[in-house]
C-alpha cells in the first residue's frame, strides 16, 4: 500500500505528514503510520529548525481564508461500497459518464439526505461529488427529463443482469412485494388495491428479490396496484430464469400461496419455502389433524433458544405431493393470546364509553370502533349506549389456531433449517422499511409512468448501497454504536476544503471518524 502525503492543520498552522497504511494482523484492520515531514511553506514541507531565516519569516502564520467546504466522508464510504460491488462500472457501461455521475448523485442523495428533486442541486453543491463531476446538470427539469429517459429504456434490466452475474447470485432468493402510493393522476400503473400501509390512495406494487447470502437486493419489478401478490409469481419466475439464475431456493410468505403457484414451482423443479394461507378447507383440515398430537415430545425442537414443535406433513395437489411442516410455537401462542385479549378488552371499554347522538348510525359507530374485530362481539343499543359482550366461542376458535402455522417446501430441508431460511425474510421487510422511511420513496410524486420507473431504479440502487453498508457495519461491529444515519453524520464532518489561493485540503480526522474507517478497512 502506497504512502500518501497530507496536510494537517493545528492551531491554524499547516503541517505536512506522510501516512503509510498497513494491515494490522492482530486487530485485522488497516491502520496508518504517520511521519512528520515539516511545516507547509509555499506548498512544500520544510523542517523549521534547519530552515534559513527568510523561510522562517515566510512561514509565519498567515490568515488563509477558506473558499469552500465539501462533505467528503459520507461520499467516500458510499463510493467505496459502489466500487466493491462494481456498481459504478455497470452504470458506466450503460450510460455516458455524465449520466452515470447523475445517477450516482441521485442515489447518494436518497441515502444521505433524501429531498425533493428541486433541492438535490443545492445538496450536491456541498458535497465532494461537485468536485469530481462539476459538469452534471441537477436542475429539476433536467432530472425529470433524465428519469423519464431512464424509465423508458432497458437500462434497469441490463444493470440487473450485470449485477446478478457480477455477484454470482445463485443460491437463496427471498421474494416479497409492497405497495407504493401516490397522489398523481398521471401514472398509468396506479390502481386501487390492497394497501399494506393502510393508505387510501391508488398504488403501484413493487416486488423485490434479495440475495440472502450477499444481503443485497438484486432484482425488482413493478406491477399495477390492483394485481394481488399471488398473481405476480409466474412472471417473476420467468424473469429470474431470463437472468440466468438456476438452482436457487425461493422463499415467499403466505401472500404468494395458491395451488397454481405450488404446481408451477414443482413443475419447474424450483426449490422453495412458502407459508400456507389457511383459507382452503382441506388446509384447515390438514392443520386440525396435525395439531392433535403436534405437542408430542418426538416433534420437539429448539429454535433461537426457545422450544418449538415441528411435525412433518404432506399435501396432495392433483398428482403431485408437496412436503411441509406444521409448527407449534408456545411462546408465539402466548404473545398472540395476550395481544388479542388486550385488544378485545380495550375495544369493549371504548364501546361502553360511547354515548350515541340522536342522528348517529349505531352500526357505523360500532364498525369504526371495533377496527375489524367485529366478529368477536355481540352488541345491541340500549337508550344512548352500547351493551357489549365478547363472543367466547369466536375467541376460543381463534386461540385454537394461535402459535400454529404451516410451511411447505421443495428440497432437502429439515424442520429447523426450513424455519430458519423462512425467517430470513426479515431482511426483505427491513429493506421495504428502508425504501419507505430512510430512502423516502413515499409518496411517489412523479408525474408520469416513465418518470416513476426511472425514480424507482434510483431508489433500488440506493437500497443496494445501503443494505451492503449495513452488512459491512454488522461485520465490523459498528451497528451496536451507530445507525446508518448516525455513521454518515459523523463522516460528514470529514471535509474537503478549498482555500482562496487554490489549495485543496482534507480536514484532520476525528477519533470517531478514524475508528469508523479503520473498522471498515477504508482509507481517507
Regions found by a protein language model. Give the residues of each.
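Secondary-structure transition/capping motifs at alpha-helix termini
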Residues: 25, 127-135, 153, 166-169, ...
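Short amphipathic alpha-helical "interface-anchor" segments enriched in bulky aromatics
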Residues: 418-445
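Conserved structural-core and active-site-/substrate-pathway-adjacent residues in large, well-folded domains
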Residues: 18, 120, 174-176, 215, ...
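Active-site beta-loop-alpha junctions of metal-dependent nucleic acid enzymes
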Residues: 221-243
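Dynamic "connector" segments at or just before major functional cores
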Residues: 1-189, 206-219, 226, 234, ...
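Acidic, metal-coordinating catalytic cores used for nucleic-acid/nucleotide bond scission
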Residues: 251-260, 278-281, 450-452
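Basic, amphipathic alpha-helical segments enriched in Lys/Arg and hydrophobic/aromatic residues
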Residues: 448-470
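An anionic, glycine-rich sequence signature occurring as long contiguous blocks
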Residues: 202, 222, 269-421, 475, ...
Amino acid at each position: 500500500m502506497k504512502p500518501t502525503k497530507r496536510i494537517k492543520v493545528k492551531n491554524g498552522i499547516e503541517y505536512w505528514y506522510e501516512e503509510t497504511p498497513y494491515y494490522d494482523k492482530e486487530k485485522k484492520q488497516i491502520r496508518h503510520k504517520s511521519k512528520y515531514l515539516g511545516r507547509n511553506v509555499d506548498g512544500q514541507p520544510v523542517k523549521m529548525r534547519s530552515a534559513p531565516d527568510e523561510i522562517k519569516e515566510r512561514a509565519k502564520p498567515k490568515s488563509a481564508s477558506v473558499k469552500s467546504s465539501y462533505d467528503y466522508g459520507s461520499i467516500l464510504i458510499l463510493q467505496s461500497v459502489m466500487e466493491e460491488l462494481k456498481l459504478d462500472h455497470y452504470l458506466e457501461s450503460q450510460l455516458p459518464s455524465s449520466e452515470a455521475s447523475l445517477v450516482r448523485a441521485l442515489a447518494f442523495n436518497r441515502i444521505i439526505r433524501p429531498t425533493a428533486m428541486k433541492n438535490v442541486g443545492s445538496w450536491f453543491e456541498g458535497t465532494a461529488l461537485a468536485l469530481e463531476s462539476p459538469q452534471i446538470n441537477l436542475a429539476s427539469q433536467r432530472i425529470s427529463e433524465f428519469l423519464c429517459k431512464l424509465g423508458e429504456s432497458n437500462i434497469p434490466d441490463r444493470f440487473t443482469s450485470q449485477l446478478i452475474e457480477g455477484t454470482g447470485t445463485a443460491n437463496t432468493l427471498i421474494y416479497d412485494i409492497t405497495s407504493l402510493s401516490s397522489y398523481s393522476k398521471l401514472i398509468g400503473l396506479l390502481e386501487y388495491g390492497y394497501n399494506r400501509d393502510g393508505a387510501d390512495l391508488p398504488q403501484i406494487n413493487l416486488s423485490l428479490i434479495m440475495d440472502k447470502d450477499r444481503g443485497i437486493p438484486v432484482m425488482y419489478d413493478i406491477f399495477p396496484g390492483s394485481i394481488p401478490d399471488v398473481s405476480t409469481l409466474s412472471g417473476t419466475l420467468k424473469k429470474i430464469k431470463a437472468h440466468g439464475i438456476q438452482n436457487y431456493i425461493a422463499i415467499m410468505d403466505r401472500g404468494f400461496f395458491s395451488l397454481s403457484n405450488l404446481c408451477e414451482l414443482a413443475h419447474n423443479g424450483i426449490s422453495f419455502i412458502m407459508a400456507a394461507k389457511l383459507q382452503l378447507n382441506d388446509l384447515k383440515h390438514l392443520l386440525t389433524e396435525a395439531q392433535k398430537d403436534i405437542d408430542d415430545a418426538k416433534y420437539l425442537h429448539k429454535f433461537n433458544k426457545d422450544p418449538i414443535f415441528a411435525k412433518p406433513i404432506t399435501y396432495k395437489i392433483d398428482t403431485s405431493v408437496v412436503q411441509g411442516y406444521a409448527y407449534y410455537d408456545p411462546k408465539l401462542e402466548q404473545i398472540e393470546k395476550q395481544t388479542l385479549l388486550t385488544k378485545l378488552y380495550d375495544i369493549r371499554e371504548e364501546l361502553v364509553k360511547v354515548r350515541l347522538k340522536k342522528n348517529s348510525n349505531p352500526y357505523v359507530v360500532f364498525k369504526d370502533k371495533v377496527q375489524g374485530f367485529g366478529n368477536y362481539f355481540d352488541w345491541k343499543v340500549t337508550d344512548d349506549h352500547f351493551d357489549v359482550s365478547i363472543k367466547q366461542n369466536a375467541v376460543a376458535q381463534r386461540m385454537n389456531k394461535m402459535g400454529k402455522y404451516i410451511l411447505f417446501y421443495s428440497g432437502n430441508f429439515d424442520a429447523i433449517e426450513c424455519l430458519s431460511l423462512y425467517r430470513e425474510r426479515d431482511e426483505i421487510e427491513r429493506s421495504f422499511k428502508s425504501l419507505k422511511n430512510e430512502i423516502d420513496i413515499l409518496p411517489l410524486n412523479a408525474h408520469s409512468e416513465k418518470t416513476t420507473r426511472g425514480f424507482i431504479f434510483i431508489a433500488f440502487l440506493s437500497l443496494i448501497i445501503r443494505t451492503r453498508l449495513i452488512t459491512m457495519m454488522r461485520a465490523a461491529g459498528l451497528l451496536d454504536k451507530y445507525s446508518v444515519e448516525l455513521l454518515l453524520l459523523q463522516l460528514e464532518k470529514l471535509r474537503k476544503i478549498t482555500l482562496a489561493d487554490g489549495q485543496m485540503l482534507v480536514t484532520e480526522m476525528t477519533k470517531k471518524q478514524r475508528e469508523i474507517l479503520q473498522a471498515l478497512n477504508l482509507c481517507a
